């Protein structure tokens, strides 16, 4: 096994579909679940249920229900009552993503979900840990680009995951493949799932939980799934309020007073963006925050009923490649019940160098970090490495996170994240920097041989100064190197010299060598 907000009143219908539906036998009320760092909906009296099969949509009588907000935290009100429970009835599908061009050069030698995070972890650990903490033990990870390190990490971190119902849990990697029926690689998120539907449909589950492998957040998926079932949804989309600056990068939606999605636009711009503005006070935001965040954005996380997924990808939209731009809007147009699940906790789409940098440095924030790895109720798991404790000799370290197995000598480190096995020499200054560390230690014999060749050992050399930078794994930074971007260059590609600059952040490539005395 691996080591280790909303206030509002929404009406929620009890509906049916062309598939088997659960209908209340009385007019008592149900609730739409909220997920928030501070507030959740109060659950009202449950009702006895009966099963009605093949009832045509539109012929049923819908009984609206009211959310009654209650000021309690998720940790205080974490009870769910899934029947059957998630370990038996839900299959997790994590999408490994595309080539990760916006994260280049961090994705030069690895898949996007394999990019190191928070000193000890990798991005893929976030959705996998969320699944395991939510009692979802059957998990597939779909990969395509540079997947060797991702496959290695998953096999080492989660190979012994045999939890769940009858100890049938697993975390398995599914690589893109060609076949006589489909000679193409994955063309998008929906196409990736479609190509493995033959495998997914063999599992006796009720829902597919579709997740992205490059998001940073903590979510109880059991509440998400419970909301899907209680609202009798065909598809449920996790959503959150969004400001105008970032809205163009996401799918945006409009919802009615029942929480049902009535309009969906993928990454709109110009007039189309303006048309997607809504009054987000319906999500429970106060007037001031609603003005700052006038959009409802999709998180790219979906719960889809199994029979609905099979029908949509095979019959309704056999040529659709993407969930956000094709399948979700298409399902809405078909009249399927597509619900929004409102989430107001911390969430970051780590799709760019700047977003990745800010997310990592955010864990050093005082007094409360943007994202905490210290939540014992929902830990983040990763590969057990059995490294020794980090050793700091006369070092001055402030507002920083230090990973396992580091050797830090007589240097200054401020507001930085230092990855595992990092070696930092005397006199170095590290500020506002993400240092990813190393995959291995070099022996004294290795260092002697490198010195004889005039080369540089892995780590940060003497008297070097690094500020606002990302130093990828196994980088060799010589003595008296200055990576401080004194000219405030915003964009530069110097791959032959071992680095890129994006959004003013210097990124040193994995395995790069920066000679002594270099100034960047």
UniProtKB/Swiss-Prot annotation:
Functional summary from the UniProt entry: This protein plays a role in synthesis of starch. It catalyzes the synthesis of the activated glycosyl donor, ADP-glucose from Glc-1-P and ATP.
SUPFAM superfamilies, sorted: Nucleotide-diphospho-sugar transferases, Trimeric LpxA-like enzymes
Q: Which UniProt keywords apply?
A: Allosteric enzyme, ATP-binding, Chloroplast, Nucleotide-binding, Nucleotidyltransferase, Plastid, Starch biosynthesis, Transferase, Transit peptide
Region annotation (Disordered) ranges: 1-81
**Pfam families per the UniProt record, alphabetical:** LbH_GLGC (PF25247), NTP_transferase (PF00483)
The Gene Ontology biological process terms listed for this entry are:
glycogen biosynthetic process; starch biosynthetic process
Name listed for the protein in its UniProt record: Glucose-1-phosphate adenylyltransferase small subunit, chloroplastic
What InterPro entries does the annotation carry?
Answer: ADP-Glc_PPase (IPR011831), ADP_Glu_pyroP_CS (IPR005836), NTP_transferase_dom (IPR005835), Nucleotide-diphossugar_trans (IPR029044), Trimer_LpxA-like_sf (IPR011004)
Task: Report the GO molecular function annotations.
Answer: ATP binding; glucose-1-phosphate adenylyltransferase activity
Q: Which family does it belong to?
A: Belongs to the bacterial/plant glucose-1-phosphate adenylyltransferase family.
Q: How does it assemble?
A: Heterotetramer.
Regulation of activity? Activated by 3'phosphoglycerate, inhibited by orthophosphate. Allosteric regulation.
Q: In which tissues is it expressed?
A: Leaves.
């Amino acid at each position: 096994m691996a080591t280790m907000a909303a206030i509002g009143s929404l009406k929620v219908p009890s509906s049916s579909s062309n598939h088997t539906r659960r209908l209340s036998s009385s007019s008592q009320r149900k609730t739409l679940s909220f997920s928030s760092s501070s507030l959740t909906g109060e659950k009202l009296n449950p009702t006895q249920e009966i099963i009605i099969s093949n009832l045509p949509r539109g012929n049923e009588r819908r009984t609206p229900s009211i959310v009654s907000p209650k000021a309690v935290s998720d940790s205080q009100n974490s009870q769910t009552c899934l029947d059957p429970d998630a370990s038996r009835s839900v299959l997790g599908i994590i999408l490994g993503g595309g080539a990760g061009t916006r994260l280049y050069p961090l994705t030069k030698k690895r898949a996007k979900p394999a990019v190191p995070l928070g000193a000890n972890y990798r991005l893929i650990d976030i959705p996998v840990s969320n699944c395991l903490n939510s009692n979802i033990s059957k998990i597939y990870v779909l990969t395509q680009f540079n997947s060797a390190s991702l496959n290695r990490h998953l096999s080492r971190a989660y190979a012994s995951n045999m939890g769940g119902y009858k100890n049938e849990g697993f975390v398995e990697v599914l690589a893109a493949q060609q076949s006589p029926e489909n000679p193409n690689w994955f063309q998008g998120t929906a196409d990736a799932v479609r190509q493995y539907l033959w495998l997914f449909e063999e599992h006796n589950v009720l829902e597919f939980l579709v997740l992205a492998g490059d998001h940073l957040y903590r979510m109880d998926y059991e509440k998400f799934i419970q909301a899907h079932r209680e609202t009798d949804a065909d598809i449920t989309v996790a959503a959150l309020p969004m400001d105008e600056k970032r809205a163009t990068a996401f799918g945006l939606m409009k919802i009615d007073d029942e929480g049902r999605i009535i309009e969906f636009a993928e990454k709109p711009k110009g007039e189309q963006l303006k048309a997607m503005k809504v009054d987000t006070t319906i999500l429970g935001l106060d007037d001031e925050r609603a003005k700052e965040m006038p959009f409802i954005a999709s998180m790219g996380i979906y719960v889809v009923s199994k029979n609905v997924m099979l029908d949509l990808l095979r019959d309704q939209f056999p040529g659709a490649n993407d969930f956000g731009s094709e399948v979700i809007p298409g399902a809405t147009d078909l009249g399927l019940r597509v619900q929004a699940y409102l989430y107001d906790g911390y969430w970051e789409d780590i799709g760019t160098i700047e977003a990745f940098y800010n997310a990592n440095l955010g864990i050093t924030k005082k007094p409360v970090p943007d994202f905490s790895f210290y939540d014992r109720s929902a830990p983040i798991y990763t590969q057990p490495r059995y490294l020794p404790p980090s050793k700091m000799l006369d070092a001055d370290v402030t507002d920083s996170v230090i990973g396992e197995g580091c050797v830090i000598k007589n240097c200054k480190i401020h507001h930085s994240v230092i990855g595992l096995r990092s070696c930092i020499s005397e006199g170095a200054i590290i500020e506002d920097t993400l240092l990813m560390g190393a995959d291995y230690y070099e022996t004294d014999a290795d260092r002697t041989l490198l010195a004889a060749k005039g080369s540089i050992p892995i780590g940060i050399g003497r008297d070097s100064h690094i500020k606002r930078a990302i130093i990828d794994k196994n980088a060799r930074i010589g003595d008296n190197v200055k990576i401080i971007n004194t000219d405030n260059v915003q964009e530069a590609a110097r791959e032959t010299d071992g680095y890129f600059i994006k959004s003013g952040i210097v990124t040193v490539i994995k395995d790069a060598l920066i000679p002594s005395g270099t100034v960047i």
